[in-house]
């Protein structure tokens, strides 16, 4: 409020307040001066305000230096925070207790420029006898209250000199200085809000698993988030205000696309000087006239995209060690072996007849390894035409051949990066492709068809075959060097005829699974059918047994499976010569009879019976006791 208040009504109101406060007119100084510890607390609370006000006080004092004035700045309750002025004036004021820490409110110092300006919430000038306390009547005080953006009183600026120096212009100087302080406070608040907003945005962009950067129209990087720096293995200070093409060598192409009004979304790019690919989207920043003023790029590691794709198209391993059914010594040794090598990065070659469960073993290895959270990608080398297997394994770039997809396509190696690649029927791979596969295994990187850049891949290779690869090498169908590269860890999966003791367990397992699948009750199997199940040679191994059990469940315990017209390989573990009477029985009864038959066949030799049944001696004795089986 720009008025010079010297009217008696203002002074009278103030004097009346002072009388009511009980202030004596003859006191030598303000009645309240803060102790050091109290004052230090006040200073800390108003530190930011002092830092803003002090420069304006110094500017104003430079105009008045040597003219007999001093400047005071107080906090919202009238406590003096800082003083600037001519030394002789300050010296006299110190004698009167007008010092830093003095309370200049009306309750402490009577009617004065600071206290009365606070009381009336106005700018005013008080001179001479207008002061309530006599000792202060030698001064003229021009004061203006400082408000924050919301109109709250936060301080006061006061200019004091000898009473004979009173002039209305001095109040104008103070008011102008206060306006400058208030404007600066607004600017500071806006700056703080901008900084806070920037910090919020930084926190948001740093918390997402996406690389984000912003560039101007010249391609100069103006901002980049932490995720981008981590993915590119760079420091923010090394790239800020640098050209983006030092990081992304395809930037000129991106910029041209955007300037031509084309979009640049879900594209695949290569990181400069690195064998790494990213999926990127770039969006233009436009002004109100639709002119491009900059661009924002958002990218992610292409491997994360591949992992997500693999997850949703079920390129994951579902089998674990719990799915490997069997208690025979051969299966126990197999389980121990694959558990011990699961975390090794070395290549694995699984060999075994068709239907023995080679992929089950491969998936179990993956799910027991430190790669279990990554992709398990399988490819059947014998099911893909020779002309396509290279692109399936290594991928291709856009335009590599007629019909190639726009943007190219990753191969199985890239899709399996950081995970496991299962090469089933490796023995069927063409010789020329074996050379390419060997090179990838040796160098750890792939080059897409039509491309010229090598992309690093970290893939655990598990290969499988039902062929005798050593014979294939002799016949010239398989490379010897590839064989040794693949068979760092050889695994042999025994056929079912070598683990007859597991047949009963597998029958029970598949009965439960197939009954659940078909929505049926577990059927009772006729004894003669069960005898055939135990004695049959199972050339198709576990897969053939599984299909046979599904047939039995469908037919409620009977079967259309013709054992006689199939090739049956008999050995010591076959029980086809044993005659069982034709009636119905439970699984427990079947187990009892199977154990009894086995013991009789072995002439009462418990050790031999244990080997055939695939169980240990203590387990067999428990079952002998349970079923009250007589041993000869």
Swiss-Prot record:
Chain positions recorded as ATP binding sites: 352-359, 416-425
Gene Ontology molecular function: ATP binding; ATP hydrolysis activity; sequence-specific DNA binding
Key words, A-Z: ATP-binding, DNA-binding, Nucleotide-binding, Transcription, Transcription regulation, Two-component regulatory system
InterPro entries, per database record: AAA+_ATPase (IPR003593), GAF (IPR003018), GAF-like_dom_sf (IPR029016), Homeodomain-like_sf (IPR009057), HTH_Fis (IPR002197), P-loop_NTPase (IPR027417), PAS (IPR000014), PAS-like_dom_sf (IPR035965)
Pfam families the record matches: GAF (PF01590), HTH_8 (PF02954), PAS_9 (PF13426), Sigma54_activat (PF00158)
Record protein name field: Signal-transduction and transcriptional-control protein
Family annotation (SMART domains): AAA (SM00382), PAS (SM00091)
Chain's gene name: stc
DNA-binding region(s), residue ranges: 606-625
Domain PAS span(s) in chain numbering: 197-270
Residues covered by the Sigma-54 factor interaction domain: 324-554
Cross-referenced SUPFAM superfamilies: Homeodomain-like, P-loop containing nucleoside triphosphate hydrolases, PYP-like sensor domain (PAS domain)
One record GO biological process: phosphorelay signal transduction system
């Amino acid at each position: 409020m720009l008025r010079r208040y010297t009217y008696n009504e203002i002074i009278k109101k103030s004097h009346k307040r002072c009388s009511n406060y009980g202030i004596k007119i003859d006191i030598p100084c303000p009645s309240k001066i803060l102790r050091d510890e109290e004052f230090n607390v006040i200073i800390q609370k108003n530190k930011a305000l002092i830092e803003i006000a002090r420069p304006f006080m110094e500017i104003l004092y430079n105009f008045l230096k040597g003219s007999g004035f001093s400047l005071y700045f107080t906090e919202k309750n009238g406590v003096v925070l800082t003083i600037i002025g001519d030394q002789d004036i300050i010296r006299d004021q110190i004698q009167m207790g007008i010092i830093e820490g003095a309370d200049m409110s009306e309750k402490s110092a009577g009617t004065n420029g600071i206290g009365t300006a606070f009381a009336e919430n106005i700018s005013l000038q008080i001179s001479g006898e207008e002061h309530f306390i006599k000792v202060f009547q030698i001064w003229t005080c021009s004061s203006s209250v400082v408000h924050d953006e919301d109109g709250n009183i936060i301080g006061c600026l006061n200019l004091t000199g000898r009473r004979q120096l009173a002039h209305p212009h001095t109040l104008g100087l103070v008011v102008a200085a206060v306006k400058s302080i208030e404007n600066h406070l607004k600017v500071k608040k806006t700056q703080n809000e901008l900084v806070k907003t920037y910090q919020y945005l930084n926190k948001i962009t740093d918390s997402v698993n996406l690389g984000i950067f912003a560039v101007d129209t010249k391609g100069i990087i103006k901002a980049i988030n932490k995720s981008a720096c981590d993915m590119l293995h760079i420091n923010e200070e090394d790239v800020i205000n640098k050209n983006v093409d030092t990081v992304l060598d395809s930037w000129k192409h991106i910029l041209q696309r955007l300037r031509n009004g084309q979009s640049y979304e879900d594209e695949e790019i290569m990181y400069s000087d690195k064998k790494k690919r990213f999926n990127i989207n770039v969006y233009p920043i436009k002004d109100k006239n639709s002119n491009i003023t900059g661009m924002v790029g958002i990218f992610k590691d292409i491997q994360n995209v591949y992992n997500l794709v693999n997850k949703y198209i079920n390129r994951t391993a579902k089998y674990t060690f719990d799915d490997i059914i069997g208690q025979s010594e051969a299966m126990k040794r197999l389980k121990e072996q694959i558990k011990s090598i699961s975390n090794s990065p070395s290549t694995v070659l699984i060999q075994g007849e068709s239907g023995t469960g080679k992929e089950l073993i491969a998936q179990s290895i993956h799910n027991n390894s430190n790669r279990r959270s990554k992709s398990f990608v399988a490819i059947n080398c014998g099911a893909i035409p020779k002309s396509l297997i290279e692109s399936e394994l290594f991928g291709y770039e856009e335009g590599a051949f007629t019909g190639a997809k726009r943007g190219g396509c990753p191969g199985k190696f890239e899709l399996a990066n950081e995970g496991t690649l299962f090469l089933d029927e490796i023995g069927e791979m063409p010789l020329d492709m074996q050379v390419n596969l060997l090179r990838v295994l040796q160098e750890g990187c792939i080059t897409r068809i039509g491309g010229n850049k090598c992309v690093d891949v970290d893939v655990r290779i598990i290969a499988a075959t039902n062929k005798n690869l050593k014979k294939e090498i002799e016949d010239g169908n398989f490379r010897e060097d590839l064989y040794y590269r693949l068979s760092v860890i050889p695994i042999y999966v025994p056929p079912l005829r070598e683990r007859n003791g597991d047949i009963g367990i597998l029958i029970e397992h598949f009965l439960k699974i197939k009954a659940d699948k078909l929505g049926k009750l577990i059927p009772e199997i006729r004894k003669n059918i069960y005898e055939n199940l135990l004695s049959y040679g199972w050339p198709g191994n576990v897969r053939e047994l599984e299909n046979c059990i599904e047939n039995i469940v469908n037919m409620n315990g009977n079967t259309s499976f013709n054992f006689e017209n199939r090739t049956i390989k008999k050995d010591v573990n076959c029980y086809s010569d044993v005659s069982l009477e034709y009636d119905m029985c439970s699984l427990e009864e079947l187990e009892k009879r199977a154990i009894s038959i086995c013991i009789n066949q072995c002439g009462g030799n418990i050790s031999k019976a244990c080997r055939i049944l695939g169980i240990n001696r203590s387990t067999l004795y428990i079952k002998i006791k349970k079923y009250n089986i007589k041993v000869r």
